Amino acid sequence: GVLVGWTKSGSRPIFDLVSGVSTGALQAPLAFLGPRYDALLEEVYTTTRTADIFKGNGIGVLVKAGLHKADPLRRRLDDIITDRMIAEIADAHREGRRLYIATTDLTNGRAVTWDMGRLAASDRPDARRAFIEIMLASAAPPGLVEPIPLPDPTNGIAVLHGDGGVMRPIVVDPAMLRGARKQTLWVIANGHV
């Protein structure tokens, strides 16, 4: 895709800030970590089959609010997002680089932006699992994939989250850019902008 081609051109920068929404949330950690993850990015996006990410919910669609279960994609992300990657993201965060992923809080009807580098650097014993669940939620279109319970950042109570693109298709907040050495903004969008 675009990132692999950009690397091959020799002009791809190391990004100071990466944000991801929807399927972009699945790509964001690999884009953030840089060209050494291009082969994995290319493999994931050229060999993944529908059966690797979706499983019918059967009668569960009546109570789970989604045609498909999130389990296959969760397992796939569990294979892709390693402890080493979490440690590398944490190191980059400590160096001042930032990784954000957006989800939609379906319970309260609001966008939530997660600081994934901060999570990776938190030393939480469940940081990797929480990281995967946030990625999963951002890529879970309401009605198609069952919502993902995540703790509300303000009170810790679990609420249902889904595709971040529902409320915020692009995550760019001017506050994210403050203090940046150089303010160049690249947007890679799948679909229509």
Task: Spell out what each predicted region is.
Residues 27-30:
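Hydrolases whose catalytic domains are alpha/beta-hydrolase-1, hotdog thioesterase
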Residues 21-22:
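Catalytic nucleophile serine of serine hydrolases
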Residues 1-17, 32-193:
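Patatin-like phospholipase
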